[in-house]
Amino acid sequence: SLKYFEQNYKRFYSHFDRCYFESEFYERGIEIVKEALKKGILEKSQGAIIFNGKKYGIDTRVFVNSLGLPTYEGKEPALAEKEFSDFGELDKVIHVVTPEQTSFFKVTFKVEELLDEKKYKDKQYHLIYEWVKLKAGKMSSREGNIIEANWLIDEVKKKILEKSKCDEETAETLAVASTKYSFLKNGTQTIIHFDIDESIAVDGNSAPYLIYTYVRCQSVLKKSQKLEVKSQILYSKVKSNLNNDELNVL
């Protein structure tokens, strides 16, 4: 349910200004497909309405099937129209989706561009986000090894509590940070091999280490303000081999 997902988003410190649902774009999707058909952007084929992508060097895809039902492709132009309407003049709409949908977006972007070049040309981008793998391999619903984000964070939290003496609240904060940073530190087109032990390591490229470093730096800065030091150093009296950049750091 939406309530369940909203609870998850709150736990991850995530927020969405607007959620779009597929059912919103059924009727408008068919209307736009018919408009595109009249303009010659789409064409009929074996009872369906398709986009022939050959002349553009991209795939041919179905927008309305032979039963008269819009496909995902058929509803996408209606979604784009709504997004550009809801948020006004946009510089770029970024779709963060797996690489398997590359063909889908190439086709729908092209159709939308042909419908309204001024509005859509070069205004949309498919940001490929690769799959996540655990040590057991790639997650797959077909193989039954899909895991939920909440489960993953809970497992990370358990490990943190096992290895440290922190309280429940601190463990929760570290677990969320460790999980999120493990995703963010990788390039979007790199398959993520999630390792719980690596994610909570107190050294190296991990959230706990970065948080620790930040806290230590804050502590040093706080203590330095209490020290009675001269605001300037008479460098002419200091005999050293330090260069100007090094002296500026001092």
What does each of the following model-derived ranges do?
Residues 1-250:
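Non-catalytic interaction-recognition regions
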